[in-house]
């Protein structure tokens, strides 16, 4: 099984995490919503798989390229 690492596209806040560890996701499913400059930016699953690890806490500050999730395919 391969691991896909999902990184942040923006600097802001991990406003809402919408998945839990162990949850199956399909390509394009929403994993998290980040807030940056009063805008909500969704982070989507790049491939189908299972959420192996959530690497950020809800409400935490995030920077561009921070590791957010690991998905096992």
Region spans (language model):
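Short beta-strand-turn/beta-hairpin segments enriched in glycine/proline and small hydrophobics
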Residues: 1-13, 30-48, 73
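Conserved beta-strand segments that form the floor/walls of ligand-binding pockets within enzyme
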Residues: 7, 18, 32, 55, ...
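Short histidine-centered loop motifs in beta-beta connectors
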Residues: 15-20, 24, 53-56
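A structural signal for short beta-strand/turn segments enriched in small hydrophobics and glycine
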Residues: 22-31, 59-68
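A general secondary-structure boundary signal
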Residues: 50-53, 58, 67-72
């Amino acid at each position: 099984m391969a691991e896909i690492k999902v990184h942040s596209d923006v600097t802001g806040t991990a406003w809402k995490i919408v998945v839990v560890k162990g949850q199956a996701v399909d390509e394009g499913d929403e994993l998290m919503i980040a807030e940056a400059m009063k805008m909500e930016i969704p982070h989507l699953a790049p491939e189908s798989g299972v959420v192996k690890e959530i690497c950020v806490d809800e409400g935490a500050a995030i920077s561009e390229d921070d590791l957010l999730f690991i998905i096992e395919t």
